């Protein structure tokens, strides 16, 4: 029924092989290891309970932000509409920037392995370059009007008339 439509969509395996997904996965794995280090390290036992909790929270937040990147890449690659791709791209960018901020937070709360944070920052910078090139591939003319006005292609406004509104549609004559 939807074979023609589905043939243009990338499979999960195809998505996982893309450079941007691979880099997003590397970011997650590194953030996950950092969070585990904070959880397991005995060297944080000397911290007061509140400081330790802040460090643990910051590490879990870092992991959570990194965890959002790959699913949103899949979401953007799984569809063709510009506005939905851009919505996912904005969430990816936000998550990647939060990972960068999270590295600073971990330093602030006393994370003992700054070399891992530097590695993570380097991964995010490499990801940023891949991301900037990737979003250039989005087809700006394959869109629906975003009535919120946030993810429309250049020159399209939230209150523009949708040309699809002029297409005749008879719900009683719709094949099921």
Residue positions per predicted region:
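Amphipathic alpha-helical assembly/interaction segments
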Residues: 1-176
